[in-house]
Amino acid sequence: VESLGGKFLTVEGSENLETEGGYAKETSDEFKKKQEELLSETLKKIDIVICTALIPGKKAPIIIKDTMISEMQSGSIIYDLAAIQGGNTSYTEVDKIIVQGGVKIMGEMNILNKLPISASALYAKNLFNFVSNLLDKKTGKININLEDEIIEKTLIK
């Protein structure tokens, strides 16, 4: 998220919100109030939201309230990865795009099955670019330029 310019929202005085398995767990009413205030103000200013809050064995918590969605900018997108368990908005529907007040709510059921193809293509592209960097462009022969930052950082010394 951060490598793409996104930011995680952190509620001040956060409790430990994860189980050992990395899932969200139930939070206190005080935390929920702080979270709602932070989300409400933040959502008015941003274009893309990615929701992932899941609680094992339970319906996903509704963390983006209807009133928050109504105050978002038209054209904004909520990408709800918790759709399989009901979603983090009340509008989320599995494998559907719902438009509510100009905001698109995308309820992706199984994003993980779609990632391997993209990840493989990205890895192949990165590997190709790295190996291409080892070649002299004029002669086509291997030329390990130790002054190239990428090559220098990948050498085992």
List PLM regions with ranges.
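Conserved active-site and cofactor/substrate-binding residues in soluble primary-metabolism enzymes
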Residues: 3, 30, 34-45, 63-67, ...
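Residues at the C-termini of beta-strands that transition into short coil/loop
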Residues: 12, 82, 109
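Short gly/pro/ser/thr-enriched loop/turn and capping motifs at secondary-structure boundaries
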Residues: 16-18, 84-88, 112-114
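ADP-ribose/adenylate-binding Rossmann-like module
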Residues: 48-106
